[in-house]
Amino acid sequence: MNQKDAAGRFPEPVKAAAGLKRKTTRLLLPALLLSVLSGCQKEAVPKSSAAVPTTPASSQAVVSKSDALLALSSYDNKYYNQYGTYGPSYKANYWFDIAKTKRMDFWTQAEAIETVIDAYNVNPTVDLKNKVQYLYHGMRDAYGLTWSNNEFNDDVIWGSIMCLRAYEIWNDGGMLTMARQNFDLVWARGWDTTLGGGLWWKTDKLSKNTCVNAPAVICAMKLYKATGDVSYRNKAKMIMDWMVPRFYVASTGEVKGAMNTSGQIYEGALLYTQGTFIGAANELRPYYTTPDYRAMGLKAMDYARNSLSKTPGGILQDEDGTLDTQGGKSIFARWACMFVKDTGTAANYGPWLDANATQAWSIRNSNGIMWNLWSIRTSDTENLNSWRTNGGVSMMLNLYRFR
């Protein structure tokens, strides 16, 4: 997940940055984030203006499932676009911004579709099921069946995960085939023994990043469960075995972001990479007793709570410096909440995640839209992009995996 330019491409990795995409313009973030952003990032964005302090989350009522569904409905009112037929069905996409200047970028589009899948998972309705299909059709319509022309291996993996999660709802063989073919594409061009293994972030083979390797573990495990082909589980284990000693800091739970061709780490933890590592550990956990993936996931969760929040145990950091990181909370919420549900750790992490959802909802604007700056009220006048405003929706919905 890295930030791209207007043409949808991402910059070369730069020193002190790595797992994101778009143009890697230097981030105008607090010192906390300056040390961690870059490898997969693509373009920097200007600072937001108008900001109105909000009531602390601790004094707010807990968000309800109906609130979470309303948040998605408000989001869809601004960004969802059903634009035509697709065979006997329909196709749709999410707009990039409120002004509808273009469709959402490839990988963020896939992530926004995953948020609709999250909604279906916690509230299965015909309407949400159909939206998942229409949006999937929109991806096929815009990008075709295989994505070899996309140089970003992580983009291809994000899209494949979306297809697999849609397949879990629809049991549509085309969704599974699309995921399988594109994962196989990334494996063929991205995996080698340079630096001991791992997937390259891009086809230029200048860095190996968590933003592709952790999601690839998730993708491979989902392919294994969908097909029964044990080679995918083996690939997931190979990736994780390579990633853990290089990116996971066992003493703290931090997950580093990227490594250059000299084997030097040049990016620290970000919410989306921390979250997908937690998701990867959770996918492997039921199948392997050693290493202890549950313990790794717990440690990574603790690091996010203590060090990727504005205060220990508080509200998640903004990560507002690039387009890619603006929606990082969306990805973190998904995989963190799945982990909490699957490991039965709601008593430990639930209050913290709930406080974040409550705080996000408390800063919504008059249209029910929440940006990623969860300490100030969302602007009513800014042309907000759809990735920046996805995190609160995801956090609210994914709580209901374990609540």
Feature map (PLM): residue ranges:
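N-terminal secretory signal peptides that target proteins for export/translocation
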Residues: 1-22
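Bacterial Sec-dependent N-terminal signal peptides
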Residues: 28-66, 70
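CBM-like carbohydrate-recognition segments
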Residues: 59-115, 119-154, 166, 208, ...
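Structural signature of alpha-solenoid helical repeat junctions
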Residues: 108-111, 124, 155-158, 175, ...
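Extended ligand-binding groove/face enriched in aromatic
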Residues: 129-226, 230-237
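Active-site cradle of extracellular carbohydrate-active enzymes
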Residues: 213-216, 220-224, 232-281
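Oxyanion-binding "anion nests"
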Residues: 273-288, 293-309
